[in-house]
Curated annotation (Swiss-Prot):
Pfam families: LuxS (PF02664). The keyword Lipid metabolism does not apply. The lineage of its organism: Bacteria, Pseudomonadati, Campylobacterota, Epsilonproteobacteria, Campylobacterales. It comes from the Bacteria. This is S-ribosylhomocysteine lyase.
Length: 164
């Protein structure tokens, strides 16, 4: 089985919170598709709570689109990592890491402004596969942690595993 790109980086050297341009590919028509690693926690040191991650999944995707989508950038998907240390974001276009950091920070500020569990989008049994597995307070705690620590740029050449 081929080794996925996400496993070709040394997770022991990865800083967090951080933004890493994980991959850029081009479609046959010439559009750039960029994949970003949006790291919330240091791998193997911290982990986001299950309910907080799920609530962030519902909130973060919309907030990031509000702050990052433009005539040159369109987010395709934002999904949590199985290790619960971050999210992957796939998009059409090639925003800078600085632009992504600004959108990430503003999205975390937006999470802190959500006042009620009732304000979480798609939080119902028809649109969510685990609609009872949410915690706005845990999502806010994660967001505040990101803002308190600050978001850095994670450079691939600094965390590349040798021999891969």
């Amino acid at each position: 089985m081929p080794l996925l790109d996400s496993f070709k980086v040394d997770h022991t050297k990865m800083k967090a919170p951080g933004v890493r341009l994980a991959k850029v590919m081009q479609t046959p028509k010439g559009d750039n598709i960029s994949v970003f690693d949006l790291r919330f926690c240091r791998p193997n040191h911290e982990i986001m709570s299950e309910k907080g991650t799920h609530t962030l999944e519902h909130l973060f995707a919309g907030f990031m689109r509000e702050h990052l989508n433009s005539k040159d950038v369109e987010i395709i998907d934002i999904s949590p990592m199985g290790c619960r240390t971050g999210f992957y974001m796939s998009l059409i276009g090639r925003p800078s890491e600085t632009e992504v950091i600004k959108a990430f920070e503003n999205s975390m500020k937006d999470v802190l402004k959500v006042t009620s569990q009732d304000d979480i989008p798609e939080l119902n049994k028809f649109q969510c596969g685990s609609y009872k597995m949410h915690s706005l307070s845990e999502a806010k705690e994660i967001a505040q942690n990101v803002l308190n620590k600050g978001i850095c740029i994670i450079k691939n050449d600094e965390i590349k595993l040798e021999n891969f």
